UniProtKB/Swiss-Prot annotation:
Similarity remark: Belongs to the UTP25 family.
Bias (Polar residues): 122-138
Annotated PANTHER family: ORF PROTEIN-RELATED, U3 SMALL NUCLEOLAR RNA-ASSOCIATED PROTEIN 25 HOMOLOG
Pfam families documented for this protein: Utp25_C, UTP25_NTPase-like
SUBUNIT field: Component of the ribosomal small subunit (SSU) processome composed of at least 40 protein subunits and snoRNA U3.
Name of the encoding gene: UTP25
Compositionally biased tracts (Gly residues): 10-35, 61-71
Function: DEAD-box RNA helicase-like protein required for pre-18S rRNA processing, specifically at sites A0, A1, and A2.
Main localization of the protein described in the UniProt heading: nucleus
Ranges of Acidic residues composition bias in the record: 85-121, 160-208
Protein name per the record: U3 small nucleolar RNA-associated protein 25
Lineage of source species: Eukaryota, Fungi, Dikarya, Ascomycota, Pezizomycotina
Organism annotation: Sordaria macrospora (strain ATCC MYA-333 / DSM 997 / K(L3346) / K-hell)
GO MF annotations, alphabetized: rRNA binding; U3 snoRNA binding
Entry keywords, A to Z: Nucleus, Ribonucleoprotein, Ribosome biogenesis, rRNA processing
Localization annotation: Nucleus, Nucleolus
Length: 742
């Protein structure tokens, strides 16, 4: 029985790479250059979150091997009690003897994935590569130096000014930053009349842009802002098709304010700039996903959409880009037209802008996701010219095929192309041109990964170097593929939201006579629209919306009624769900571990010989370390041999653990969610799976086996995706604590 799954609720933190400020950097070859420049030059470790000991990605050593966080990589764990250990023989000999008993067909998949991991390491463009050991880094540097010497005659003549570049340390530390920008700041309102996107647009008082940003009713928004500040929200649950909508509006006592926006079925129902309406003329009717997100999106209300799929991803990008462009074009046209009015009469008081120019921020997981968003922008905007497009293609587009078709669709969608998560890109618009790599303060839209933007802002340890003024006037935040961001360093996302819409520390050429009053009153965060697209809901996303979404227009959470993936499994297998009690969220980890050691482990010990083929899947790295140490040090489980694969495991370590597990040398295999998310190993030899925490989805293939899942009442979000919304509610509240599915 092989195990395949998909990462569900995130077990915390994430991995980061250091750069400027106080981050610990580490040089490394990245296939033709790595991040440097104003991010601090070297790629290293970023700050980890408290959920998971600052851990980061982990797609094997080929994608790096450390978790985000300060401090060195943990020392290698002497992992397993090996059955039938031959003290006179080397470990390599033992491996050879065991593997000789396994058919080539059985380990073929393992070898293919190992080769794939090695190829990914050589490609130099990892998704969140785990930091390599210092030894491997040294070898990499040596190879690079040897290669340089071989080039000899092709090498450019060196001048005295180049002496520093010969230093071996600088050879890895000094890298080209493909995202670096060197251009001066422009005045936010500096634009000629010919840059108008539409010259003859008439103002429409019913346009949501007018009612929310340009000319909102002061009495209305002030009353709502007071309610938001007092945390007074009214929640209405609305059923719409297959979605559940939890609609929150500031409680002001006015019942008319609690209605959902009118449905939108096509482009004709939107208040678009003429240029955008013409480019969208062929896309007249919206599909189901577009109809679901459009009413809240185009009415400037916050939204957490928890039903993003690979199939609906293009539709969601289209709506997000159309809305972002519509907002940018209307904002810029208003500024340019008012420039003309002020040239005729400088006594006019026209307030039409914020402190800085950037108005839209898009947080995305990888460079490839940025490519997809940019391509959709170009499709919708139809620019006549694209400045620096070649540079963008060279730095972001990767057309190589890295994965075979047997990888899951969502995995290929996320990690195909350039899966580098260290990027930031400014984009500036004029009537005819899109300019890539514009300076942040000259940009209209900023595309960035959480890590890339965090590095651009700087480190808290050196506050003088912090620069987040370019986020002071962001009016629209779009977070796409938030479920993938959860597997990175979620603390970076929280850090960014904490620095949105703060009062700028420098003027940056701002004409304060044209700044909208609510900016001056420090109320910008109550006008900002935040839109989050995710495959599912998690406590982290719900908390992000609760803490950082203060939109006076209201906010909503949309997610489907789940039928449960358990009924769609390709094989019939016995699945047992065991509930344990936890007094609070803080007490949940201890209660979970206690239940595991008292109720699960004794069964493995009593039947140690029959325990072969037991895979223990552990979402949280902290829990993984706890369980691993228990198996290694507790005499009660001395008879159970085990191996482990975590996000730290390099390719040889993971291969060895899988081989020992397949041959039965390791009866138990500990496997972390993050390792599975980034590698998607097909583990062979699995006879039973134990989940220490309920997961988002589960797929078993090629054979029969049993599954046991531990859960508490705090796992309801994950549990409902597995067993279904209705069943999950009963399983949490019913008196019994064991539930069997066949």
């Amino acid at each position: 029985m092989a195990f395949r799954g998909r990462g569900g609720d995130r077990g915390g933190g994430g991995r980061g790479r250091g750069g400027g400020g106080g981050f610990r950097g580490r040089g490394g070859s990245r296939g033709g250059g790595s991040r440097g420049g104003d991010r601090g030059g070297s790629r290293g470790r970023g700050r980890g979150g408290d959920r998971g000991a600052s851990r980061g990605r982990g797609r094997g050593s080929s994608r790096g091997g450390a978790r985000g966080g300060f401090g060195p990589r943990p020392s290698k764990f002497n992992d397993a009690r090996l059955a039938d250990k031959d003290e006179d023989g080397s470990e390599e000999d033992d491996i050879s003897e065991d593997e000789s008993n396994v058919s080539e067909e059985e380990i073929e998949g393992s070898e293919e994935e190992d080769e794939e991991g090695e190829e990914e390491a050589q490609s130099g463009q990892p998704y969140m590569s785990l930091l390599k050991s210092f030894q491997s880094a040294t070898k990499s540097k040596k190879r690079k130096l040897d290669h340089t010497e071989e080039e000899g005659p092709n090498k450019a003549t060196k001048t005295e000014d180049d002496d520093d570049s010969d230093d071996e340390d600088d050879d890895e530390e000094v890298k080209e930053d493909v995202d670096a920008v060197d251009e001066p700041e422009e005045d936010p309102q500096d634009a000629p009349l010919e840059d108008l996107f539409d010259e003859d647009d008439d103002l429409d008082d019913s346009d949501p842009f007018e009612t929310h940003f340009a000319a909102p009713d002061e009495a209305t928004f002030q009353a709502r802002i007071k309610a938001v500040q007092a945390n007074k929200w009214r929640t209405d649950r609305i059923a719409q098709n297959s979605n559940r909508i939890y609609y929150n509006t500031p409680e002001t006592g006015d019942s008319t304010e609690r209605k959902l926006p009118h449905s939108i079925s096509g482009v004709a129902d939107l208040k678009l700039k003429k240029k955008l309406a013409e480019s969208m003329a062929k896309h007249t009717e919206f599909d189901e996903a577009e109809k679901a997100v459009a009413p809240l999106l185009f009415n400037y209300q916050d939204m957490l959409y928890c039903n993003r799929t690979v199939a609906s991803s293009e539709s969601i990008r289209r709506m997000a880009c159309l809305h972002a462009l519509n907002h940018v074009f209307k904002t810029r046209d208003r500024v340019i037209k008012n420039n003309t009015k002020l040239q005729r009469d400088d006594t006019l008081e026209l307030r039409d802008q914020g402190f800085t120019r950037p108005k839209v921020l898009m947080l995305l997981p990888t460079r490839q996701s940025c490519v997809k968003m940019v391509e959709m922008i170009c499709e919708v905007a139809s620019p006549e010219q694209q400045e620096h497009r070649k540079r963008f293609d060279e730095g972001y587009v990767d057309k190589s095929t890295k994965f075979s078709d047997d990888k899951p669709e969502d995995f290929r969608d996320l990690f195909s192309g350039s899966d580098d998560d260290m990027f930031r890109l400014g984009m500036k618009f004029t009537r005819k041109t899109i300019k890539y790599f514009s300076q942040f303060y000259n940009s209209d839209i900023i595309f960035a990964s959480p890590l890339g933007l965090r590095m651009a802002i700087g480190s808290e340890e050196e506050k003088k170097k912090l620069d987040y003024d370019f986020l002071s006037s962001i009016e629209l935040v779009i977070v796409d593929q938030a479920d993938a961001l959860l597997m990175q360093n979620w603390e970076h996302v929280e850090f960014i939201f904490e620095h949105l819409n703060l009062q700028p520390r420098d003027a940056h050429g701002c004409d304060f006579s044209r700044v909208r009053p609510w900016y001056l009153d420090d109320q910008a965060k109550y006008f900002r629209q935040t839109v989050i697209f995710s495959a599912f809901n998690t406590p982290e996303l719900a908390e992000l919306q609760r803490l950082h979404c203060h939109n006076w227009a209201g906010k909503a959470r949309l997610h489907p009624e789940y039928p449960g993936v358990i009924q769609y499994l390709g094989v019939k297998t016995r699945q047992t769900f065991s509930r344990f009690d936890a007094g609070s969220i803080a007490a949940d980890p201890d209660a979970r571990f206690a239940y595991f050691t008292k109720a699960i482990v004794p069964t493995l010990v009593k039947r140690a010989k029959d325990a072969a083929g037991t895979l223990i899947f552990i979402p949280s790295y902290l829990d993984f370390v706890r369980v691993r140490n228990y198996f290694a040090n507790n005499p009660d489980v001395a008879s159970v041999t085990f191996g482990n694969i975590s996000e730290y495991a390099d390719t040889p370590e993971a291969s060895r653990a899988r081989s020992h597990f397949l041959t039965g040398r390791h009866r138990v295999l500990l496997y972390t969610e993050r390792a599975h998310h980034f590698r998607r190993y097909a583990i062979k030899g699995v006879k039973r799976v134990i989940f220490t925490k309920s997961e988002q989805s589960l797929m078993l293939e090629h054979g029969l086996g049993t599954v046991k899942v531990m859960f508490s009442k705090y796992d309801i979000m994950k549990l409902e995706r597995i067993v279904g919304t209705k069943r999950a509610g009963k399983m949490i509240t019913e008196q019994g604590d064991t539930f069997d599915f066949v």
